[in-house]
Amino acid sequence: MNKALILFILIILAFSSCKKDEETAIVDKSEMEKGIYPDIILENAEYHIGENGSDPILLKAGKITFYSKDGYALTEDMTFSSQDERKDIVFSGSAGKGSINTDGSNMSLWGGVVFKDEKRGMEIRAENLELDRDEDTIVADGRVMVESEEGRFSGYDFKGDMKTGVYIFSEIEEGELNFE
């Protein structure tokens, strides 16, 4: 009788010690409501994304949650970089969270985004940023700060073309040009 009681208590303890950590999991809550769950969740992971013919992106993140059927991944505490065929860094950066198109390499980033265009020596800081690798464009809504050798600017609704090096604000709040 005592063995059965001990076994019952051990089973209860085992099940009560397991919990689902919904607060720290980066899972698309709207997808979970539809019954769509991630394929895999990686912690402290490195992952390469990119198509043939484009410079792949090395992604390092505290967590990466993959939804391979839908072709995207959610990230948390991430850094990223891309190198060209000569192994020169094209761009790099960091963000608190992101949504990555794993079929291509487009990224939606938010939470203290820092994006560095290494070839042009420019750093962009924004709360959110969209990187479209197909068009080689950057879009950041809201307040954005840009710093380079040419100067420092802050403004709103930033758009950039990485092919041509043309970067514009819809409204400049303040700026400083260096004429050297």
List PLM regions with ranges:
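Mature-chain termini and adjacent capping regions
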Residues: 1-180
